[in-house]
């Protein structure tokens, strides 16, 4: 599935570049996305995800109301959002981020499939505080370049991976936070224990990172299990959107 999404993104990029004008006069001070997350007083520090659909779940919210969802997250104590902007498979829109930012004071991770440095400048231009990089979609050189560009723009970076083969690519990146996805983006299968397994198996390489556990959480007991095992940072979407958590 990941390869298909990336190919679609490549096909769309030229059109996107023609359609969107990058604002070059932006405040490049650090956005402090992760600092805000770390400073949360919540037992579980959750990045709440907003998305209308996904390849694994189909339509998640038929009655999709962007601002109501964001306000509900804020009222529940969530200080950081992840907003899907990918159009074809998640039915996202780039306009979602400025729409939220114009109304609400909250940190936003742009959730998309970044394969070109232009997308980083665009993320900054629309008001994102943090970008997602997917290790499986990028070379080691691209990862390092994109992190450098993001930092120059004042953006935080969440670099995520699923496959343990990616460890060699990410072990020495200049980041303090890393995401481990419980979902295999090629098969879309989810293993709720995957993040803990990878963290423990590669503890020498990963011990310096704050780890964000991503995908598959549907019960409070699962969050408790992770916290007991030393991880209290989470990225959760579907279960929150459906009211399961």
Model-derived regions, located:
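Conserved N-terminal beta1-alpha1 strand-loop-helix module at the mouth
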Residues: 1-108, 115-118, 140, 151, ...
């Amino acid at each position: 599935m990941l390869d298909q999404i990336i190919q679609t993104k490549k096909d769309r990029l030229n059109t996107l570049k023609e359609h969107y004008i990058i604002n070059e006069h932006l405040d490049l001070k650090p956005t402090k996305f992760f600092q805000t997350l770390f400073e949360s007083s919540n037992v579980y520090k959750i990045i709440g995800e907003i998305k209308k659909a996904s390849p694994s779940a189909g339509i998640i919210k038929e009655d999709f109301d962007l601002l109501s969802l964001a306000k509900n997250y804020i009222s529940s104590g969530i200080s950081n959002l992840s907003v899907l902007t990918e159009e074809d498979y998640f039915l996202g829109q780039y306009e979602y981020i400025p729409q939220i930012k114009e109304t609400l004071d909250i940190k936003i991770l742009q959730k998309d499939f970044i394969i070109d440095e232009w997308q980083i400048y665009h993320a900054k231009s629309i008001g994102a505080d943090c970008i997602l990089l997917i290790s499986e979609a990028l070379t080691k050189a691209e990862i390092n370049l994109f992190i450098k560009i993001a930092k120059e723009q004042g953006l935080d970076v969440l670099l995520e991976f699923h496959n343990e083969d990616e460890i060699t690519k990410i072990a020495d990146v200049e980041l303090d936070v890393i995401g481990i996805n419980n979902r295999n983006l090629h098969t879309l299968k989810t293993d709720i224990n995957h993040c803990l397994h990878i963290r423990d198996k590669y503890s020498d390489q990963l011990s310096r990172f704050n780890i964000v556990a991503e995908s598959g959480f549907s019960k409070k007991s699962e969050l408790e299990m992770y916290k007991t095992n030393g991880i209290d940072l989470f990225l959760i979407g579907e279960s929150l959107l459906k009211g399961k958590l």
